[in-house]
């Protein structure tokens, strides 16, 4: 019986893993639903301006848009700058 329990537990773990992955995807989609359409272009424009002065990758700029029930919108911008000298 322990051999059968082993195979049954794998299916249960696989199903719970698939459920967890689906919940993550749904949560990500829901979080992206409320973002403005201009946000990707805004991120690219900000990255272009920063690149005029500092050599950074696109992964170094994180843009997050949050809006609460009181219609208060917050645009959060995190830029990881390298420890190099600026290019002027």
Swiss-Prot record:
<comment type="similarity">
    <text>Belongs to the MinE family.</text>
</comment>
<dbReference type="GO" id="GO:0032955">
    <property type="term" value="P:regulation of division septum assembly"/>
</dbReference>
<keyword id="KW-0132">Cell division</keyword>
<dbReference type="Pfam" id="PF03776">
    <property type="entry name" value="MinE"/>
</dbReference>
<protein>
    <recommendedName>
        <fullName>Cell division topological specificity factor</fullName>
    </recommendedName>
</protein>
<comment type="function">
    <text>Prevents the cell division inhibition by proteins MinC and MinD at internal division sites while permitting inhibition at polar sites. This ensures cell division at the proper site by restricting the formation of a division septum at the midpoint of the long axis of the cell.</text>
</comment>
<dbReference type="GO" id="GO:0051301">
    <property type="term" value="P:cell division"/>
</dbReference>
<dbReference type="InterPro" id="IPR005527">
    <property type="entry name" value="MinE"/>
</dbReference>
<keyword id="KW-0131">Cell cycle</keyword>
<dbReference type="InterPro" id="IPR036707">
    <property type="entry name" value="MinE_sf"/>
</dbReference>
């Amino acid at each position: 019986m322990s051999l059968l329990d082993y195979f049954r537990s794998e299916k249960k773990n696989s199903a719970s893993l698939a459920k967890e992955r689906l919940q993550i995807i749904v949560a990500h989609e829901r979080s992206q639903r409320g973002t403005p359409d201009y946000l990707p272009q805004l991120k690219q424009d900000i990255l272009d301006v920063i690149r005029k002065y500092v050599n950074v990758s696109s992964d170094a700029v994180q843009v997050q848009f949050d809006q609460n029930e009181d219609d208060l919108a917050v645009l959060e911008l995190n830029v990881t700058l390298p420890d190099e000298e600026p290019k002027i």
